[in-house]
Amino acid sequence: MDRAVFYLRIFPGSEAEYDRRHAEIWPELVDEIRESGLRNFSGFRRGTDVWYYTEAGLDVATALAVHGPKPANQRWNRYFRDVIAQITDDSGELLWYDEVFHSGGPPLDGPFERALFGLVIDPDRADDYEALHANPWPDLMEAIEASGFRNYTGFRRGAHVVYYGEFYPDMTTVFAKMAAHEVNDRWGAAFEGIITTITDADGNLLAADEVYHQD
């Protein structure tokens, strides 16, 4: 299973319209997304910044390449020409984030919340950030699983990192449980000087609101 995140930016003032159009997308577009092999496809918006998390059986890039020329998708893209300000780089590639961390865990029953939040690192310490996540401590991984994180995955693009997760029963409860584990403080201390921004002025995580989901 391949996991991926890409980014887009919408025009200021178009936030409500972007959300409205995604509240109920066209049935023919839903069919095309499924035919292309994309699964667990979720969009999250914070202001004019939007991130999409998705999965595919082989690889997401191939599935999106299959999806791109489909007729409903072409009409959908044109429909957003006055809403989306940027979705590709100068070469025409989507603005991908690279996966740097993943935690799975056995399936859990009951309700859960899909969520995405971001943080900023010192770009000069990007190698240190990735090295720590390439070999996470066993007791950290145990605490993550025990706290109710599932499919918890980090992605980086430059100095910006986003985390997607499925939180049982919700993100607030899961992070409160995680904070009770001693390893959480040690892990946080390891990133002093690496992570420069992780909360807003009120101390809240920089979370984005889910505006779209398709299984």
Where are these regions (language model features)?
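Short glycine-/aliphatic-rich beta-strand segments at the starts of folded cytosolic domains
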Residues: 2-16, 112-127
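Short, glycine- and small/hydrophobic-rich beta-strand elements in well-ordered beta-sheets
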Residues: 30-59, 141-170
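An amphipathic, aromatic/His-enriched active-site/gating alpha helix that lines ligand/cofactor pockets
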Residues: 32, 36-39, 57-93, 147, ...
